[in-house]
Amino acid sequence: MSSIGTRTKPRMATAIPASITIPNRVDTRLGPLRFFDGFPDEETVRRLYDNLDFQRAVQAFLTAMPAASLAAMREGLQSIGVSNTTVAIFETLMDSRSLFLTANTESIYTVGWLDLREGPLVVETPPNVLGLIDDCWGHHVCDIGNAGPDAGEGGKFLVLPPAYRDEVPAGYHVFRSNTYGNWLLIRGFMVDGDPAPAVRRIKATLRIYPVAHTGRPPHTHFVNASGRSFNTIHPTDATFFETVNRVVQEEPAIAIDAETLGLLASLGIEKGQPFAPDARMTQILQHAAAVGHATARAMSYQSRIREQYLFDDRHYITRFVGGSHEFLRDGVRLLDPRTGMFFCATGNSPAMSARLPASVGSQYATAYMDHKGCAFDGGRTYRLHLPPNIPARDFWSIVVYDTQTRSMLTTDQQFPSISSHRPGLAINRDTSVDVYFGPKPLRGKKSNWIQTIPGKHWFFMLRLYGPLESWFDKTWQPEDVEELPEVEPVEPEAATLPRMSTLAPSAVVIADRIETPIGTLRFSDGLPDEGTVEKVYDNLDFQRGVQSVLTTMPAAAMHAVREGIRSFGPANETVVIFENLLDSKSLFLTPNTESVYALAWIDLRNGPVVIESPPDTLGVVDDFWFRYVADVGNAGPDRGQGGKYLFLPPYYAGVPDGYLVLYARTFNLGFMTRGFLVNGDPTPAVENIKQHLRIYPLSKADNPPVLTFANGSGRSFNTIHSSDFTFFAEVNEVVQEEPGDAIDPETLGLLATIGIEKGKPFAPDERMKNILSEAAYVANATARAITYRTRMKEAYFSPDSAWKKVFVGGNHEFLRNGARMLDARTLFHFYATGITPAMAVKMPAGVGSQYALAFVDAQGQPLDGGKHYRLHLPPNIPAKDFWSVVLYDNQTRSELQTDQQFPSISSQKAGLVVNPDQSVDIYFGPKAPRGAARNWIQTCSGKGWNVILRLYGPLQSWFDQTWRPGEIEQVG
């Protein structure tokens, strides 16, 4: 790289905030990251991409767990013969030989798998059962039975497949699923401890058949699953991703949100595409599965979520936080509770999460630790005291589970449980109950004893069926479990294989020691030690910080634009117009130097705002999350004739006549329009905009206030978001100012995990601030790698060229097959400003504009301001109107500051030298080549740069690639 020691200050240089640049070296947990003036070196790029893939895979493991869990359920059921016409029923209850997440031992489980690929299915349900249907992604479809629309009377349910459009017959409870595969769960109830009556009733009345066979429905078969050893628990190794891929391939894209599909697509899991990770990616997925698995265990067994703890001074937790089966609170997805739920349980229903009236439904409390905060040890003996008047109208139960598999603990007892139905249960005189856990029963306590196994950790769940008010008002609370120190522990060596033991697949358990990119992780029979918990939570916070930056960069970018505009004057009253064009003194993401820009900030908090658009301009309005709202001008509904646009704020009711009406999802909007030069002169465009552009509140339409036009040309101001910790403060302002539903729950949930949540102060402690500061730099570095050294093959115009696109995928929402193209979004918003379909879609030849970017020379090396280069544009440059070449600073992505006012050349430039064959050679370097000054753009020694070639009115030879720009060649 060139030396910066001899560089003098360019004439156009302005003060650049350090917060928008990145140092030449940043020390991080990934190792030292090195840059040449904002351009990452090869080793840095490798580290950043390895980290990006690893962290995305960890995030995918935690996010896609419901899909993997339901896929494992399907495979387990199909292994014992379950199909559309055959269901499994546990006639003598479910015992510990079946690997099933935290099932109870008091219900008659009937489970099936509904395949809707051939059309709708009818499910005729028995009376007095409690059931549900969930889709392949763990989303609730409907409740059945006592909590369903049949209210426990039995009924006919019609389940429709995705996109079903045929006539729906009458006489059914109709529900639509977003997936073809659906899990059916029905639970019957014992009568005086006997399951037989419920089994007979279910077998006599449960029917599943295609709606097309309503006249003569086929017989429904039943497989007795009691005592059967089969697995329904998802894998936790790299095969997890293969499992999720099968779900993605089989199900429609509408089944899950675009962000989740985009996350999976970034790992190679994309609908219609083969999942074939190479050796590097396979190793990354293996490490990510291990860390994701470890993180899920930390979330489940040592939760940081205070609301999960049912009582202030005890160790009981609830799986559902916020009272929502969708894990939503004020529009925010609760990410950790969702992971904890699907890691330890199956079945998602509002009846499980909502606060039902007293004595209705059931309530759950799970404990992983004794009163000292120590994990339960299968070789030790414990006592649980349930105080008098246990608040269960129907009955209560306690079931013990294995910390490795989260299924019932396998012991010599068929059922590792106790309930109030248990014959011989000892009840104290005051109606309290003492329950004992240990490898051997205490003398006289066997009736109240649940066996544990030395060398095995365990946890238990207390269930209250028909919970009473004293549970909800917390006047009744179970005691914490206490170890009985007087009882001698039993060592694992003395233990024998339990009578009910079953082989757990290695893919569902975790080793005692794992080497990972975040260090050595240690476990004791599935329980992470303190050091491991600290490591996975630090990594989780760090990766969420990085992902938050990459995901919310559009919002931070708009925030910076607002601050820049407001430095000239208030919103709704001020237009920044570049009367002498936009030069390099203004810090603005990749503007051109051939248009008259006019910018304004629109604030809808006090009501609708009108924009009267000038004729013959090209404008766009984007919201505060940088999403497209409207085209204004030539690409808008006024077709360049000028028009009155009315922008309505969120929740606004009533639409007045006489306007082109647009609905906004945010109160803050950014408006940008461009006028066009006439024979190289900006004056006509400036006069046109000043004469016709009006912005005013609808309430003042009868007497609009005067609009202030501020000349931005030659002014030094910043519209570029921060790259350090202050990035998070910028995004927090957006979250606080805008409605809670302005952005999707997943994004809000991601931000909430790092402390950014509407209505709450963003006040990270010292630990979190340090993590986020590092995450901000790593995210900024990652955005630079994605932009300057992109891996997206479709970003390049051809495999042998450095020229690439700013919009990848041809969609302004960065969508492909329902999946968000995460890297494409990052590339655009790190590098450019202004979202509109007009920039992304292919227009007819001769219409609109096209862009080509280059960040490296013909040898793949970063463009160095101390060296000399040449760009050859072959004959017949395909631009009906004109073309231009503009240089930008790698640090700021704004115009390169040199001695030249405009770091650009265009076909409109007076004196441009055109070769005899109509080709053009353009030169770049710190000094003009002899005889080529008219075709020279200056660069600065020690500064990196990049270039955009713009074609206005692009012709067909551009689209069919019979014309291509030359590569940038180093000369001299």
Place the predicted regions along the sequence by residue.
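A compositional/structural signature for long, glycine/proline-rich flexible linkers
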Residues: 2-972
